[in-house]
Amino acid sequence: MNQAHRAPMAFSPAALLALLLALVSHTHAAEPVPGPAKPFAERLAAADVVNGRVVFGRCRTCHYPDKGAGHQNGPSLWNVWGRQAGTQEGFAYYSQALKDSRLVWSPEILDAWLADPRGFIPGNMMMSLGVPDPQERADLIAYLMQFREQ
């Protein structure tokens, strides 16, 4: 058969639209529909500390949770619970916004902070955009809860 004389394949607009809709509906059918996040207490009770350590890998550029590790680009996270934000001794780079916030770190406050650091305290200097996944935040917080005085 001579390829030079083959007529181009033609599709009707309706056939193209049907094909496009089938592809789009198939693609979106596999994606879960996000619902409201479970309450923090439920997420924390189901937290995976091992995954929290993995999630903390994103934070390690600026923070260390280990006792005696000191500060990096961000303050040490050792024994952060119950401490007023912006008051870690030896860390000089807190934003005025964080110092003025007067918030005290708790697991619930950290969950809200990590959901949207820039929106939670506008003007703070944290480089990260946070941890958008609610369960990953709970996993991370459960991991960080290990790093405190007993």
Description of each model-found segment:
Residues 1-10:
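N-terminal secretory signal peptides that target proteins for export/translocation
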Residues 12-13, 72, 121:
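Short, solvent-exposed loop/turn segments at the edges of secondary structure
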Residues 13-24:
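Bacterial N-terminal signal peptides
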Residues 23-31:
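Signal peptide processing junction and immediate N-terminal pro/mature segment
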Residues 30-55:
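Electrostatic cytochrome c docking/interface patches
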Residues 49-53, 64-106, 128-130:
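Gly/Gly-Pro-rich "capping" loops immediately C-terminal to redox-active cysteine motifs
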Residues 52, 56-65, 140, 144:
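The canonical Cys-X-X-Cys-His
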Residues 104-150:
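C-terminal capping alpha-helices of c-type cytochrome domains
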